[in-house]
Regions:
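FIC/Doc superfamily catalytic core
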Residues: 1-115
Length: 115
């Protein structure tokens, strides 16, 4: 998003969230907000970290555990974000994040059982 449009784009994102936060399941809502924030890309640095914080904030706020994007999956994560920015393909993003969510939960529960 061009610099001159950043304020409007971010305000629109917040308004969209407020209007739709009860319409979607928390994971889907978190993915949409994350992807759109990444598409807006308001900062020179740190957009990914802030986007993942938004993703997990929405999940935790709705009493869902947070999701982790594993280092070995970062390349696919970046490809998904690029695809979303080009053609707003939400299905690929949902598929990716659902797999990551399952992976996160499996790793956490396995680690918990080991201890």
């Amino acid at each position: 998003v061009p610099v001159k449009d950043l304020d409007d784009a971010l305000n629109d994102l917040v308004l969209w969230y407020k209007k739709h936060k009860f319409r979607f399941k928390p994971l889907i809502l978190a993915i949409i907000i994350h992807n759109q924030f990444e598409h807006i890309h308001p900062y020179k640095d740190g957009n990914g970290r802030v986007g993942r914080l938004l993703l997990n904030f929405i999940l935790i706020k709705n009493k869902y555990p947070p999701i982790n994007i594993y280092l070995e999956d970062r390349f696919e994560y970046y490809k998904i974000l690029q695809k979303y920015s080009r053609i707003h393909d939400l299905k690929s993003s949902i598929d990716f994040f659902v797999r990551q969510y399952k992976k996160t939960l499996e790793k956490v529960t396995t680690k918990h059982k080991e201890n």
